[in-house]
Amino acid sequence: METTAILLLHCPDQQGIISEVTKFITDNKGNIVYLDQYVDKVDGMFFMRIEWELEGFLIPRDKLYDYITTLYAQRYKMKFSLYYSDKRPRMAIFVSKMSHCLYDLLARWKAGEFNCDIPCIVSNHEDLRYVADQFGIPYYVWSIKKDHSNKEEVEKAEMELLKKEDISFIVLARYMQIISDEMIAEYPHHIINIHHSFLPAFIGAQPYHQAYERGVKIIGATSHYVTAELDAGPIIEQDVTRITHKDTPESLVLKGKDLEKIVLSHAVSKHIQRKILTYKNKTIIFS
């Protein structure tokens, strides 16, 4: 498979952006293999994802970022990110005691669905070490006291591990701890959470029990980027399933677990493929 460059950009909408960027690529012998764009009419913003093959491309990789900055970013007031398909993201998974999302992520990774590396799994409990062992992934445990008196110390150790392993992004696979503002600042829009409800409904703990008490007719799951405000980050993926008055809190939990696995895996896949742009508190998901 040919190595490709992936350019994600957004800027105020104006005439000629697509033409300028595609001409720059083709004039330098790049073969464009993907292009998707969107205009937000309300805010007047332009968003684009473009990918091209690097074989025969005239501009060296170590110069490309500077070229784009000089030629287009300043001129169009453009913000952009540049990635390469042969540089695999490195994902850390954080878990607590529930295994369903962890198993699903690791099975998909083992099957080749995720083009990434998983150097470590981090937990606040020993419970899921056997899962990590099955897949040959190092498992690190830092227990957090009930009064959270060692939380800062634990996060410092976790951050040292993440930096040592050159982690690109973090997935909270039902990790039942609140991430500090300091860690979020180190990985802005690079920490993915799965919340077991159709946000913004039923935030916080036990959403399935909240849904049962409310008598809702659908339940859902939401994957989002983590921000300082609990369960309020940019939403990446959501799904729902219908329920009836015959469902119990226990049956809702079982149905919800299936949703959580699907929604989280889709969000992770889109992040790995560089198909997500964040703007304000929303995401633009490219096809």
Regions found by a protein language model. Name each.
Residues 1-89:
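A conserved regulatory-domain signal marking ACT and ACT-like small-molecule sensing domains
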Residues 129-134, 184-186:
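Short loop/helix-cap segments at secondary-structure boundaries that form the rim of catalytic
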Residues 133, 137-165:
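Adenosine-nucleotide cofactor-binding segment
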